[in-house]
Amino acid sequence: MPALATGSACDTGLYELLAALPAQLQPHVDSQEDLTFLWDMFGEKSLHSLVKIHEKLHYYEKQSPVPILHGAAALADDLADELQNKPPNSEIRELLKLLSKPNVKALLSVHDTVAQKSYDPVLPPMPDDIDDEEDSVKIIRLVKNREPLGATIKKDEQTGAITVARIMRGGAADRSGLIHVGDELREVNGIPVEDKRPEEIIQILSQSQGAITFKIIPSTKEEIPSKEGKIFIKALFDYDPKEDKAIPCKEAGLSFRKGDILQIMSQDDATWWQAKHEGDTNPRAGLIPSKHFQERRLALRRPEIVVQPLKLSNRKSSGFRRSFRLSRKDKKTNKSMYECKKSEQYDTADVPTYEEVTPYRRQTHDKYRLVVLVGPVGVGLNELKRKLLMSDTQHYGVTVPHTTRARRSQESDGVEYIFISKHLFETDVQNNKFIEYGEYKNNYYGTSIDSVRSVLAKNKVCLLDVQPHTVKHLRTLEFKPYVIFIKPPSIERLRETRKNAKIISSRDDQGTAKPFTEEDFQEMIKSAQIMESQYGHLFDKIIINDDLTVAFNELKTTFDKLETDAHWVPVSWLHS
């Protein structure tokens, strides 16, 4: 806080005025007693002290110190919650102890009260004996500075009255506690609003700075205080309120990107929730479409779309299935577990909206999270996985695929493949024991759920690459998968960096390598775009494989953080 000035020319002038007043008033005073009273009053030390205090406060108001934030207490609570998820050490324990002290909490609360100017007197409740037929008018004066008022209004189509539609959490109106949903607005700064449209009233409010005076008729409906705990959601789509024609007030909207974590501040409105970005120190909330409303309008907008597992072209594609032998040109090869029995689950993926999440940090006794790698053919996913395995064979592991193909002389059961009969394979398929499977040259190949469990049971990080539509079924409490999408660079960079590289061919069973073609590059880009468009909301991390070394280092850093830092995961994974 800036120090107050100790004196000014204005102070001296006022003191001289006080000293001169008795002499100036003497001709108008009838008795010596009255004159003595005036001399005593204007010479009183307490009066001079009050004048001095007035001058100091006047000087302080001119300085207008602006608080850095209005929600220090809430920020301290959020910090304490965040520290609870950090590995404990002496400094963290000391800080948590400090933040939990009552005097520190009280200090932060007082700071917020002053910063929010919430010290104005609150009007007493309306008397019980008031005449029901007589409207009780309330005059409210708010100081909003340059921030929005934090309330939306609407016009009642039947009565024509202008009423408060919603109060934005953390805004000036909410902090004042004087304006409530349903209050009828009669005047703004002395201007009657009965015959005005909401847009005109908003214009009046936007042009008003400093103090705003409202004349309102309080709503007779009693508000029920919200008792919601902290709710966090992960946004599964991009949103710009300026492009949304349905939002009641574009200025009150909150924009976000796919993958952003939002804190829900209010779900009172079934259509429009109030939220803010997680970690944002600004206490004001913004409007976002509710989950039900967003799902409904997206479903109505795209009724003709039926989500199907990702399919690539039927040309001779490059490469086998990565986790097991699989020709991409066979239309009936690529199947995922539950595809037949639970195909309706794909419908939900067509309209991704929000997912409730919570922080999760792996404890030392927990199994490692399953790492799922997704990417188009030729992007370098196999090479990245190979480099990871070579970097630490004791820490990383991969699944051994099952097959019905006959074992060759140089192969060992359980090393290259787990060899089983066709009957047993088909039985396991019926029992949903495969994550995904396919058929190649009349032989089945597949990755089983038990093979993933086997790697995790060895206290290793299981590296699994699958088709993107399979990811949905792996997102369970047991595996807690972390999904990484390996994305190709631009087609110009592909031409430049992959011109001498080769891709595995599917023309023979030996996996012959052949140079990349222009068609391979175009197919890679197209496939990546489809994957990101349809399944991007399931990806936790996107790594562009422009340079293999750079991509590998980024992947390694991501894994290190995954094992030590807290990450947002679906609530169902921890509360099932």
UniProtKB/Swiss-Prot annotation:
Residues 139-220 form the PDZ domain. It is a peripheral membrane protein. Residues 10-65, 67-122 form the L27 domain. Phosphorylated by aPKC which promotes dissociation from the cell cortex. Keywords: Cell junction, Cell membrane, Cytoplasm, Membrane, Phosphoprotein, Repeat, SH3 domain, Tight junction. Residues 289-383 are annotated as: Phospho-regulated basic and hydrophobic (PRBH) motif. Gene3D superfamilies: 2.30.42.10, L27 domain, P-loop containing nucleotide triphosphate hydrolases, SH3 Domains. It is found in: Membrane; Lateral cell membrane; Cell junction, Tight junction; Cell junction, Adherens junction. Acts as an important adapter that promotes epithelial cell polarity and tight junction formation via its interaction with DLG1. Involved in the assembly of protein complexes at sites of cell-cell contact. This is MAGUK p55 subfamily member 7. It comes from Rattus norvegicus (Rat).
